[in-house]
């Protein structure tokens, strides 16, 4: 399975005709000035999946890059996230539609995937945001809907009000030091695709001796090993960089495979919630 992966590999989504690219490109903290350039570099390198959010304040720049790339819109998978609920469903829906306009300003523009950015903050907020996302999906402005930073209990709680359930994606922090095994196991048992943000641990582990030894063994960078690890765990990694050479290198992960011993060694680095650099979900 793993050896046959390519940059064009995709995963099916529940009850959806869409295919989610196995590798995504993250743009968190990519400023307006650099975001367009970075996205164009990523698209030229073969990425076909860009992950942004309202909170990142660069949706418009992502949309601009998609237009400038010359690649058909249908060939690029765009994800965004709604950060907080407004006072009611209609106001929250308008925030989502505003994001869609920024990302795809055609009359029939759409976003492929829209997530609740932090499903662990407010149960009432989740209810409002999900209803707004369901409306946007019903109208074709959003193709699929999901969650981020959700544990089992947050997703289970949605059953009480959701017309669309389960969410097609759960995007959580994932890397060898924070494997969130319970959330991953639950999500995958429900057919929910698991996406990995911070797969490179923001370069904080670049000097880790265990990681370095595996990178040296394969003549790869530590970042390439971490991206490949995610792919072989059946997670969808979303590596982020604004350095062109690193953007390209992070996509060059399909010519090698981590063996069973490599995977076991990396699995053994897990520190549970203490290994998180952003957030470990509460299950």
Where in the sequence are the language-model features?
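Structural motif corresponding to the early beta-alpha repeats
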Residues: 77-90, 103, 113-120
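Beta/alpha (TIM)-barrel catalytic core signal, keyed to glycine-rich beta->alpha loops juxtaposed to Asp/Glu
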Residues: 84, 118-283
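Residues at the N-termini of beta-strands
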Residues: 49, 110-113, 144, 169
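Short, acidic/polar
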Residues: 30-43, 88-107, 128, 155-156, ...
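N-terminal binding-site loop/beta-alpha segment at the start of enzyme catalytic domains
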Residues: 1-76, 132, 201, 282
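Acidic (Asp/Glu)-rich catalytic clusters
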Residues: 14-15, 63-73, 100-109, 159-163, ...
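CE4/NodB-like, metal-dependent polysaccharide N-deacetylase domain
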Residues: 92-116, 135-139, 161, 192
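Active-site mouth loops of central-metabolism enzymes
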Residues: 22-33, 82-90, 122
